[in-house]
């Protein structure tokens, strides 16, 4: 199920980035990377693809956070307006990122007994 969530998140994000590419040429590499990841993960749960999804989805979320708050020098110097489409896309990417981290086993600390005890104090 987690792999399906990552595939869906990559595919949806790829579609959004591709649709916006005429206004934002810098979205083309993101759309291509997301398409490669979605297709690759649909064919195989290879660890390198899961790690790629973590890097790309996390990077897109971080890049948007910077673009919306301060701008990104040389690439996108002006602040990006916050829109509903952007927030929805980032929410989908965040779900995909969490699912990819789960596939990688990086969320095990959340369910450990020691972690649960320390968080409940």
PLM segments and residue spans:
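Membrane-interface extramembranous regions
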Residues: 1-121
